Amino acid sequence: MASVSTWSGIRNKLENDYLCPALRGHIQYFATSYSKSADHEGRAAIRMDGVEVLRSNYYIYFENVWTKFHHLRSTTLKDCDSAKEAIDQAHAFALEQGTFDQKVFYEAFGIFDNQSIEKSLVSENPLVRIFALLDRRLGKRRLLALEESMEQELDWVRAFYVIRMQAEGLMDRE
């Protein structure tokens, strides 16, 4: 697939090419970078009818990464060779906590856009799994078949499964 380099191109693909018909006009993807912040850091969100269901920003993400990194370096990964391992684990931990910045959001889209729906559904990256849950290529039967595995899913990812199930009329709205 061709690379999409602009936010408007990414948003267009997510909202028009990939998003299931039942959620079109309801789900909006948002990302921005702030020109006056160092390195143009920013935030990203997924909105449902204008309400941010999932949101995070660089500063929350950065705080979670560095807190976890310093914890790992002072406990289980003390030697110098483990610094890269510690930072990789810290980034993964922060993402599992539902924190990310717009760059992580863009990277997740890049992964999602360049692999099959099957791989996206089982991706290590929770944002990729969310994109897959909202994808038009995920049919109702397969959506229903995911119910058991969703019990083990992160709460903030499972919320998008519920949104999709309700939109498809497969689950009552609470």
Describe the role of every protein-language-model region.
Residues 1-174:
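Alpha-helical scaffold segments
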